[in-house]
Curated annotation (Swiss-Prot):
Coiled-coil regions, chain positions: 8-32
Compartment list: Cytoplasm; Cell projection, Cilium, Flagellum
The keyword Oxidoreductase appears for this protein: no
Function: Dynein-attachment factor required for cilia motility.
Official protein name in the record: Dynein axonemal assembly factor 19
Record disease entry: Ciliary dyskinesia, primary, 17: A disorder characterized by abnormalities of motile cilia. Respiratory infections leading to chronic inflammation and bronchiectasis are recurrent, due to defects in the respiratory cilia; reduced fertility is often observed in male patients due to abnormalities of sperm tails. Half of the patients exhibit randomization of left-right body asymmetry and situs inversus, due to dysfunction of monocilia at the embryonic node. Primary ciliary dyskinesia associated with situs inversus is referred to as Kartagener syndrome.
Organism: Homo sapiens
Disulfide bonds: none
Coiled coil is among the record's keywords: yes
An annotated Gene Ontology molecular function: protein homodimerization activity
Keyword annotations from UniProtKB, A to Z: Cell projection, Ciliopathy, Cilium, Cilium biogenesis/degradation, Coiled coil, Cytoplasm, Disease variant, Flagellum, Kartagener syndrome, Primary ciliary dyskinesia
Gene Ontology biological process terms in this record: axonemal dynein complex assembly; cilium movement; determination of digestive tract left/right asymmetry; determination of left/right symmetry; epithelial cilium movement involved in determination of left/right asymmetry; epithelial cilium movement involved in extracellular fluid movement; heart looping; inner dynein arm assembly
Amino acid sequence: MERNDIINFKALEKELQAALTADEKYKRENAAKLRAVEQRVASYEEFRGIVLASHLKPLERKDKMGGKRTVPWNCHTIQGRTFQDVATEISPEKAPLQPETSADFYRDWRRHLPSGPERYQALLQLGGPRLGCLFQTDVGFGLLGELLVALADHVGPADRAAVLGILCSLASTGRFTLNLSLLSRAERESCKGLFQKLQAMGNPRSVKEGLSWEEQGLEEQSGGLQEEERLLQELLELYQVD
């Protein structure tokens, strides 16, 4: 067997374990989100707290304060370092984002795409249809806001149509209205800012070179501008942007 053909089982085991951990975290937080909705929590902060604490287990009667502990109560915090801190130290070679499931996307989004520009390019690379398939059932807790922030911070005129397609696909995902209602104030502002940018990108084209709407309609391919504007108006309503 060639040296290059030797399978690195240790690396495969680590990758599998990381994938299983990410999948478990995704399912655990989703379950916590549903529990919080059923409990009719009073505020977004309370809802967020329930989900972020989903990995914690309730203390049993035998667990007494001051007693000798052989296992850390919060296994996700070891010597002042959290699981997320350890996970972000793993920095494999950059590769195109190719998630097969929403759990894959969630893992790669958090581990391999730390910066806004990287996240934005990954969203453009996947495109609206692919994102719609990945999140057909639901967008994970807190993820919708992060997606909107990445789009709002880096959208450019050349990407206007692609971003509209992404927003359209996200709006068709399961429990979209619920996830939209759970956006933080900052995320809502980013969402509003994103649509303001998209509107501004469309307006200059309507008076480009002094052309009338009829003349410009002939210049635009297949009425692309009119279609974008129609879609933008629909999305403004879906995302509840005034």
